Amino acid sequence: MEGIILGIESTAHTFSFGRVSTTGELFPSFSSLYRPEEGGIHPREAADHHSETTSTLLERLSDSEDFSWDSIVAVAFSQGPGLGPCLRVGASVARTLSTRLSVPLLGVNHCVAHIEVGRNQTGCKAPVLLYVSGGNTQVIARADGRYRVLGETLDIGIGNMLD
């Protein structure tokens, strides 16, 4: 069945609603970034930000020309890795939307989602990939539709180091 999968990203400082068709077409996303006054991310404050911006982001999504709630066939959400309080907000919003729309709820690994979007957009077929994003730096192998982490940083991810 062709339709749209609504994705919810809430692993850390960004809260987003994104869309992808069941045929792989990407649509513009709607995001809000938590910016602490100083220092790094404060997980509870970031989660509060996500809760406070949910309505605004959903309104922006609803008002976009190419969007219809009737086209949603599933709701996907980042279930980890990420910051616990932030992940809980995303999961709660996803469960609510899934229930209201009577569509399946799909928990997604945040790292795998990054990789799969990249593979979808580039046609990459390489069996071994280097994944670098925020707090995650991993060497990952893909075989038979599954991923296996071959190695990863133990102290700090390259993305965090660069931040």
Where in this protein do the model-derived segments appear?
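Short acidic/glycine-rich loops and adjacent helix/strand connectors
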Residues: 1-163
